[in-house]
Each structure stands twice: as C-alpha cells, then as structure tokens.
Curated annotation (Swiss-Prot):
It comes from Escherichia fergusonii (strain ATCC 35469 / DSM 13698 / CCUG 18766 / IAM 14443 / JCM 21226 / LMG 7866 / NBRC 102419 / NCTC 12128 / CDC 0568-73). Belongs to the class II fructose-bisphosphate aldolase family. TagBP aldolase KbaY subfamily. Homotetramer. Forms a complex with KbaZ. Its EC number is 4.1.2.40. Binds 1 zinc ion per subunit. This is D-tagatose-1,6-bisphosphate aldolase subunit KbaY. Pathway: Carbohydrate metabolism; D-tagatose 6-phosphate degradation; D-glyceraldehyde 3-phosphate and glycerone phosphate from D-tagatose 6-phosphate: step 2/2. The lineage of its organism: Bacteria, Pseudomonadati, Pseudomonadota, Gammaproteobacteria, Enterobacterales. The gene is kbaY. It comes from the Bacteria.
Length: 286
C-alpha cells in the first residue's frame, strides 16, 4: 500500500455518488484513531494537515507514520496539504512525497488567485500531485487561519467555471454557507448555488467547514455533487472533551497510554459517523 493522490479517490467518489472524508490530523494518536475506523469500515480517507500541523510534527515524521499505517491497515491513503498558501512550501513538501495539496488563494482577487493556483498546478501535475483550490471565502477559525464574517463571500457559479478552466485545478472548494469551526448562529447552506456550480463545473467539489453541520445537510451536498468533506473541529472537541472528563474522574492519573486512548476512542466515534454520512463504507476494494 502507499500514499496516493486524492485525484484517484475523488474520481471514484464522483463516479459512484459518495464523498471521501478528509480528517485533519495533529499527531500519531489522531492518525491512528482515524485509520483504525477507516480500516474497519473499509472507507477511503484523506488525512489533512495544515501548515500548523507541520510546525508541530515534521512532515517527514507524518509521512513515515502514514506510510507505515497504510501497510499495517492494508489500505491506500492520501496525505493532503490543507490551506497552504505558498508555492515554495508546497514544492518542498511534494518533493518529500506528498501527492495532494490545497493552495489557498481565496483571499486574493480573482486574477491573483488564478495566477497563484495555476503556478501550483503546473508544478504539482509534473509530480503526479493533485491540486485543490478555493473560490469564495469561508469565515471562521481553523488553526492559524482566521476569516471574519465581513471578509467571507460565497462562490459565484460562472466564476467557478472560469476559474477551473483557467487553472486546470483537480478539485474545487466552494463557499456555500459553511464556516470553519462551530456555528454561533443558524446555519444557512445555499443548496441552489451548489447545484448551479455543479452544472457548470465538472471537477470534484469540496465542502470545507463540515464540523457541526447537520448530517442531513451534508448528505444533501453530496447528492448535489460534493465528493470531499472536510472535518476538523469536531474531532478536536471530541478528543479534548474525553481527556478532560477522564482527568476529572482520575485527578491523580498520569499515564498517557490511558488518557490518550480515551481521547482516541471519542474521536473514533466522530470518524465513524462522518464515514456513514459520506456513504464511503466499503468503497475500498478488497
């Protein structure tokens, strides 16, 4: 087994009407928790790391862990660079073995976003690395990324069509009303906008900010063409909440083999639910 490009996973998902879950990782325990469930449920998976992730644990260490677990669990997996903003940073990580990258130029005007994404696509495609980009701007907070409500805006379908044609990007993250983090007010997803984007864009579509989104809403986006669903905040909350509860019951506890496993088990329940919502159970061939 090996680390593969997300292109192959997403093409199959698009052809067969399901979505591939993309879970953000932070350390060995989070990687292991996610893959234990994906292996059991035979679900394809994308392990996503933000620039902050790779400051906490070196890319080479994460890559080695993922490669080892791919063999242990007998399943291919994709290691994905989430919300990266620099071609030089992506170039270095691709040369180290990563085969999936998101270049986030959504904070730039359209022409500058196109120029940046096209430069990344040209390089990555020469290395069999797939590229995701974002058009529109999600609000909220994820790791070191913070976007206030005034700076957020939704994806225009016709601009999305032009963007994909001009850049050659492999998948497109669309802004349709979700946000990074948890929701402080009523969530309103623009399903009609998503349907209009799907009509004019033929590459796989990506839903960012899927934490705290009702399951039926996520399923509806998949019906309308989303093939990659990103989950981050819910995983961290489950892990941290379980560890806090363990220490509340075991104030003298100090053995990470116990409290880390409690956190992992809580995270696994979130992973299990998201796989079911994505419809990706048994989508890995034996």
């Amino acid at each position: 087994m090996s680390i593969i490009s997300t292109k192959y996973l997403l093409q199959d998902a698009q052809a067969n009407g399901y979505a591939v879950p993309a879970f953000n990782i932070h350390n060995a325990e989070t990687i292991q928790a996610i893959l234990e469930v994906c292996s059991e449920m035979r679900s394809p998976v994308i392990l996503a790391g933000t620039p902050g992730t790779f400051k906490h644990i070196a890319l080479e260490e994460i890559y080695a862990l993922c490669s080892a677990y791919s063999t242990t669990y007998n399943m291919p997996l994709a290691l994905h660079l989430d919300h990266h903003e620099s071609l030089d940073d992506i170039r270095r990580k691709v040369h180290a073995g990563v085969r999936s990258a998101m270049i986030d130029g959504s904070h730039f005007p359209f022409a500058e976003n196109v120029k940046l994404v096209k430069s990344v696509v040209d390089f990555c495609h020469s290395q069999d690395c797939s590229v995701e980009a974002e058009l529109g701007r999600l609000g909220g907070v994820e790791d070191e990324l913070s976007v206030d409500a005034e700076s957020a805006f939704l994806t225009d379908p016709q601009e999305a069509k032009r963007f994909v044609e001009l850049t050659g990007v492999d998948s497109l993250a669309v802004a349709i009303g979700t946000a990074h983090g948890l929701y402080s007010k009523t969530l309103k997803i623009d399903f009609q906008r998503l349907a209009e984007i799907r009509e004019v864009v033929d590459v796989p579509l990506v839903l960012h900010g899927a934490s705290d989104v009702p399951d039926e809403f996520v399923r509806r986006t998949i019906e309308l063409g989303v093939t990659k669903v990103n989950v981050a905040t819910e995983l961290k909350i489950a892990f941290a909440g379980a560890v806090k509860a363990w220490f509340a019951e075991n104030p003298q506890g100090n053995d990470p083999r116990y409290y880390m496993r409690v956190g992992m088990d809580a995270m696994k329940e979130v992973v299990r639910n998201k796989i079911n919502v994505c419809g990706s159970v048994n989508q890995i061939s034996a």
